Amino acid sequence: MALTKAEMSEHLFEKLGLSKRDAKDLVELFFEEIRRALENGEQVKLSGFGNFDLRDKNQRPGRNPKTGEDIPITARRVVTFRPGQKLKCRVENATPKD
């Protein structure tokens, strides 16, 4: 099961007493700020959580799996996430819920 933006909004509504609309707007604004920073080529550092970085991948040769034809895979920019040490430790020591 995955945590969704709607569930995050619901948690903010329950824990902080925000209105449902304000909670939804807060979650949307948070992710919009991360998107904006990455679109501008900036690194996003969330203390105690991790870093979002941009990485440029070079063009490379590829192959169409159906036809076997060689095709170039174009150069592109990708987003990577590196978890921080605190997050790694908490995940490692967490007991999964069923």
Swiss-Prot record:
Subunit and partners: Heterodimer of an alpha and a beta chain.
Lineage, broadest ranks: Bacteria, Pseudomonadati, Pseudomonadota, Gammaproteobacteria, Enterobacterales
Function (record text): This protein is one of the two subunits of integration host factor, a specific DNA-binding protein that functions in genetic recombination as well as in transcriptional and translational control.
Manganese recorded as keyword: no
Pfam families: Bac_DNA_binding
GO cellular component, one term: cytosol
Stated name of the protein: Integration host factor subunit alpha
Disulfide linkage: none
SMART domains membership: BHL
Family the entry assigns: Belongs to the bacterial histone-like protein family.
GO molecular function annotation: DNA binding; structural constituent of chromatin
Organism listed in the record: Edwardsiella ictaluri (strain 93-146)
Chain residue ranges for the region called Disordered: 49-71
Record keywords, A-Z: DNA recombination, DNA-binding, Transcription, Transcription regulation, Translation regulation
One of the GO biological process terms: regulation of translation
InterPro entries with a match to the protein in the record: Hist_DNA-bd, Histone-like_DNA-bd_CS, IHF-like_DNA-bd_dom_sf, IHF_alpha
